[in-house]
Amino acid sequence: MKKLFVSVVALLAAVSLSAQDVTAIYNEAAAAFGAKDFAGAAAKFEQVIEQGLDSEEAASLVATAKTTLPKCYFMMGGGAIRTKNYDEALKNFTKSAELAELYGDMSQMAKANGWVAKIYQIQGGDAFNNKDYATAAGVFEKGYKADPDNTAMALNLAMS
């Protein structure tokens, strides 16, 4: 009986310590997000999700991390697009859309997919202007798949 009691106390202490660890990581993630270190914040929010998934005490932190993680990748995509690093922007916006869909944030998914389509429109336009119509058509097709409501993309696809 004494061993059982000691085991239960040890287990409860481990769960409590784990929840404290998740809280500390969450606070680091929030600080990084506030400092606009979106890559650092994304890594920490991923840790919060992984480590807090089985903890009832950390459920609200995990829920917030799941909401904020796609936004981190969205912001990294925005930073990459400002420097015209379209490949990096495309990677981050795509990751944002995938995570938003996974965690049920359809509004964030639509915003990220809208930017994916815009990047494909830029890349397709460059190929089209260089008279590389086959490449342009392939790129416009990817953009149209990302944002099927984009009528300009559909028109570009039809013209190429």
At which residue positions do the language-model features occur?
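Short coil turns that delineate tetratricopeptide repeat
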Residues: 53, 101, 148-149
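Canonical tetratricopeptide repeat
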Residues: 61-68, 75, 108, 115, ...
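Position-specific recognition of the canonical hydrophobic site in helix A of tetratricopeptide repeat
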Residues: 33, 81, 121, 128-129
